[in-house]
Structure formats: structure tokens, C-alpha cells
Design a protein with these regions (language model features):
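Conserved protein-kinase catalytic-loop segment immediately C-terminal to the catalytic Asp
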Residues: 279, 284-286
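Glycine-rich phosphate-binding P-loop
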Residues: 275-276
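Phosphate/dinucleotide-binding and metal-coordinating scaffold of catalytic cores
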Residues: 1-268, 272, 286-405
Length: 405
């Protein structure tokens, strides 16, 4: 088994020495460095946790065209792709440096250097500025560490790092759902969210809308996903993952009120949007990369898997009071029980049926729009019942079935 030696870096500070498998890109051996406090939070509990963090860092092979790219380029695994791109990311400041290399963070940072994304199959029209190109582009790509299953890519638009997202399937609903979530948060007056804009995709078999947003990490701020926050400290078996996350956040400088307020608002708005995929990689915190203190909760992002986006979840095919989710609890109603302040969402400021219909009208291939909108209205009624009564409405409660006319 051939091995290669690297140093795990945080900007220009050595974090650990690594031996990587030359073929698979997996971590074989870890030798801690002199700065253990710089270890990635999700890989700070020993060598095995760092191996898992590295594996999670690699782009999922299920994402978009990644499997085809690996086959085309003869790359054996997503971890190998990560190694070829020095483990670089547009979410944080970790990277790997080959032993003996004189590379510095200034040389490789994707926040300040140009890059070319290998996934050229998804292009956009540029109403908000032109994507830059460079004849002197380094070989490093942020695609190797880009998370999630949907096809997506990083672009540089007017010197700003932007993420372009596509859809699963033949219509634009998931991307337009991101735009809808932005609309909802803006109407609520909630500033800490990612602002998604709709963009026309070109070069695909069927013309669709994607969505684009600016990177919320930077040269000074790192995104730490909730899974890494949770994994950074051993959890007592008597403590829920939800409370453990809050505890770790407060230990790193955030106030308990700030964290709870954010999580409860997110739970309530995810409920009305029927966002079923708020797993621990889909929210987190922003960290000051110099002090390592948490600065604030990361803005709400990734709400595409909402609004009954998959047909089996259409309201007439599922119980709107017991929709299962990938989150802190197994169902939406169980998540609502975590909310202590029901006033965090203003019912009168939620988007109306006509506003959503106008947004979905951008793509006439979106099916079941009337059913989706009826489901949304049902969820508003359920949420209003929760706001008034303090308990989730139960199946059979007459007012939870038909929206007001």
C-alpha cells in the first residue's frame, strides 16, 4: 500500500501530520501537531474522528455528475479527488500540504485565488454579472469538498464567490423552493438567512431554473456544520442531541438565547414550508478563524427539499400532521415540541398562495401546483393552531384539514 505524507493545515498553521493512502485518499495515520486546538471540531476526538471528518469532507459520489467525472478522469474515489485538490473548501480554512512543499495559504486559498470548476455541464445566463475566467487558473477546485446530492458548482461572479444549484429531476421546484424560503424570511424580517436568486440554466436537456447565492464563509469566517459541533464533545446519554448542540455553542461563545431563538425560528419556518431535510449538515455556526470563537449562527440555507417536492409527500398522499423529517426528531410535530416561544413567526407575514403560484409559474413543468399550494395552506392552519394552543394539531381536528377560504 503506497502512502503519501501531508500536513493538515489551518491557513498557515500546522495542525497534524498525515499519512494518506495514495490510491484511495483515505487517512492511514495521524500524528498530532503542536496546536491541538486547531484541529477541525468534527475531527478533534482522536485519529478515528479525524478520519471520519475527512471522509465527510469529500464530495458525495451521489452528487450530480461526480461519479461520471471520477470515471472520466480515472480518479478512484471522492477522497482521492479531495487529495488532488489539497482538501480545499469554500466553507473553511483547512487544507493539506504535501511534505516538503513551500505552498502557503495565500497561494492556495479559494477565497482569493481563481479556480475552474470541472463540472461544466451546468451553465447559467448571467443577469447579475459575468462569471470570471482565468488563463492562469490553478488546478484546485472547490467541487471536491462540496456537500449535498443536488448538482451544484461554485462560480466567481463579479469577484464574489457564488454557489449555483440545480435540481433533481426534470423541473425547477427545488431551486424555486430556495427562492421561496428567502422570500419568507424577508417578509418575516429575519435577516440571518441566505438570499437565493432564481437563474435560468442553459445547456441541459430541458431548460430549468436554478438558484444562486453568495458564499457566507470568507477569509475571516468559517462555516462549522452542526454535525461537527455535536461531534466535538462527548455527549451524555441523558442529554438530547438538540440540547448538546446548544451546550457546545454556548461553550464556544454564543448565548443560549441566541441559539435557541434561531433553532426555534428555523423549526417553525421549516414546518410551514414542509422542509423535511434539516439534517446536521444543513445548519451550523460561523467561527472566527483567528480566535476560534463562534461568532453567530450561520444563516439559514438549503431549504430546497420542501413544499411537498417529492410526489409521495403530496398532502392527499400523506398525513400532514405526521410528516417524517431528517432532523433532531423523527417527525415535524415532535420538532414543534422543542419550541418554547411560539411568537417567533408572524402568521400574517407568511407568503400567500398567489405569491407562491407566481413564483412556480416560472416553470410550467412543475406538477401538482394546486395540490402543493393546498398543502401549504393546510400547514399554515396547523401552525396557527400550534401558535394558539401550544400543542400540535392532531389528525381529526376539524380545523386542521381545510384552509380558510
Amino acid at each position: 500500500m503506497a502512502e503519501q505524507s501531508y500536513e493538515l493545515m489551518h491557513k498557515d498553521d500546522v495542525v497534524a501530520s498525515l499519512q494518506l493512502d495514495d490510491l484511495s485518499g483515505a487517512i492511514l495515520k495521524v500524528t498530532p501537531g503542536a496546536n491541538p486546538e486547531l484541529l477541525p471540531l468534527g475531527g478533534s476526538q482522536g485519529a478515528d474522528s479525524l478520519r471520519k471528518w475527512w471522509l465527510r469532507r469529500a464530495v458525495p459520489i451521489s452528487q450530480g455528475n461526480i461519479a461520471a467525472l471520477l470515471q472520466q478522469e480515472g480518479i478512484p474515489s471522492t477522497q482521492s479527488l479531495l487529495v488532488r485538490n489539497l482538501g480545499l473548501s469554500l466553507s473553511d480554512h483547512y487544507w493539506i500540504k504535501p511534505n516538503g512543499s513551500e505552498l502557503t495559504w495565500k497561494d492556495v486559498s479559494l477565497f482569493s485565488n481563481s479556480f475552474r470548476d470541472p463540472l461544466e455541464s451546468m451553465q447559467i445566463q448571467h443577469p447579475h454579472g459575468a462569471a470570471s475566467t482565468s488563463t492562469q487558473t490553478p488546478a484546485y477546485s472547490p467541487s471536491a469538498s462540496l456537500q449535498g446530492d443536488l448538482i451544484k458548482k461554485w462560480l466567481i461572479v463579479d469577484d464574489t464567490r457564488c454557489l449555483l444549484k440545480g435540481n433533481r429531476g426534470a423541473n425547477s421546484q427545488q431551486s424555486l423552493n430556495e427562492v421561496l424560503a428567502s422570500m419568507l424570511h424577508e417578509k418575516q424580517g429575519f435577516a440571518n438567512h441566505v438570499h437565493y436568486l432564481p437563474v435560468k440554466l442553459t445547456g441541459s436537456a430541458s431548460e430549468q431554473y436554478g438558484c444562486i447565492c453568495e458564499d457566507f464563509a470568507s477569509e475571516t469566517l468559517e462555516f462549522i456544520p452542526a454535525i461537527d459541533v455535536v461531534d466535538s464533545e462527548k455527549k451524555d446519554n441523558a442529554v438530547s442531541t438538540y440540547e448538546h448542540f446548544i451546550h457546545v455553542c454556548t461553550a464556544h461563545g454564543l448565548s443560549e438565547l441566541e441559539v435557541r431563538s434561531f433553532l426555534e425560528y428555523q423549526i417553525l419556518t421549516d414546518f410551514v414550508l414542509t422542509n423535511t431535510d434539516r439534517h446536521l449538515n444543513n445548519f451550523g455556526v460561523l467561527r472566527d478563524s483567528r480566535t476560534l470563537n463562534f461568532v453567530r449562527m450561520a444563516p439559514i440555507f438549503d431549504s430546497g427539499n420542501s413544499m411537498f417536492w417529492d410526489a409521495p409527500r403530496l398532502p392527499e398522499r400523506s398525513n400532514c400532521t405526521e410528516i417524517t423529517v431528517n432532523s433532531f426528531r423523527k417527525t415535524e410535530t415532535e420538532l414543534l415540541k422543542l419550541v418554547t416561544d411560539r411568537s417567533r413567526v408572524h402568521m400574517d407575514l407568511l407568503p400567500g398562495r398567489n405569491e407562491i403560484a407566481e413564483l412556480y409559474a416560472k416553470d410550467d413543468s412543475i406538477a401538482f401546483v394546486d395540490s402543493i399550494l393546498t398543502g401549504y395552506e393546510k400547514k399554515k392552519v396547523l401552525l396557527e393552531h400550534f401558535m394558539e394552543k401550544g400543542i400540535p394539531a392532531q389528525t381529526g381536528h376539524k380545523r386542521n384539514i381545510e384552509p380558510e377560504r
